[in-house]
Amino acid sequence: MGARETALNALIACRKNGAWSNGALKQLIARDRLDSRDAALAARLCYGVMQNRAKLDFYLRQMLTGKLSGLHPVVRDILHLGLYQLRELDKIPASAAVNESVELARKYCSRQKNAPALVNAVLRTAVRTLGSWQEPTSYADRYSHPEALIALLKQSLPKGQLEPMLIADNTIPPITIQVNTLKTDPQALESALISHGVTCARHRWMTDCLVLTNAGNLEHLEEFRAGLFYVQDPASRLSVQCAGLQEGWQVLDCCAAPGGKSFAACLSMKDTGKIISCDVYPHKAELIAAGAKRLGFDNIVPLCRDATQDRADWTGAFDAVIVDAPCSGLGIIRKKPDIRYKDLAQTEQLPALQENILAVQSRFVRPGGVLMYSTCTVLPRENEQVVARFLEAHPDFYREPLALPEVFPRNESGMLTLIPGQYDTDGFFICRLRRKQ
């Protein structure tokens, strides 16, 4: 089974079962036993089609004699894969893109007798007319974001930031890793990774982070197995850096999976004190435990726990509480492209949940302690507005300025929204709150 078939199965799983593309693709790559080269191609094809679905449909309409809505969903998936290869992957011969697509149609569309012929005809037309296709002009078609999402982002983002975010959402993000400075240093790890053929460089503003390309499956690297690094977006790392954690502190990370913020906290505290890392799902708590063990961290205590539940014996017990709240995820579309297609109505109840979690977790902060609130979305209704309502109901807390790297403007508000494309990060919101003495 090749990369194209794996990518097709991932697209089908996402469409039919509501699976997330990254999870479905990872499982299918393992199931199909793809080597690193085919795994990379499968990922590029799956994410590329996800990122460009509306744009590919725009092209398809120019080549079909019938209506797009009349296509069988799997035929449409196969045509998307073929067109994406022809349009975006110039190293793949056109003949291979066409022929492999026809074979997929024969295998997966046996009940649609004309499917192979249709796929062949459409893609050969595409090859013949390549370079003269009409290009989309609307944001919805050009950047493959639903109209409703574009309208929401337009009213949520600062002026001039909408199109840069849409562009960033369709880029392939680099992999950023945090060096485990308790075991090694950036220079030594960089040299080791380069020796394995990995292209890497220091992150331009985040200390002890490396940016990787051509990395393949990181889990196969000896340095990964030895716990010398873990993957974390610089925005997520920055949120922990802004907490100003000190050695020996008692820290609660209430929505911790997969563990990146707890790991960053451990490095900040040099594996001293204690970090209780919670998640509501047992398998995710186990994931945190496995990561901490691999990295050699001793101060992390994984716990299966619901962040909306109070606990009397934790009242005022922590120097810092980290709340990385469940959110709409609109800041990480570049990593999970299918988020853009989710029903926005399902996100309207999130602010109430976020406020509830923040209120419950605030009880566990000691007088003078720190409460960090973060999300991976750019919507004010899940960010600034949640903080405003929390502070109105909890006058014993106040916002505190953020200490940021020099690349950022001076921050006095205690809140920072990162827009994808601005600082080479995911979209993210960070707020630092302190409890009065």
Name each model feature, range by range.
Residues 1-437:
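S-adenosylmethionine
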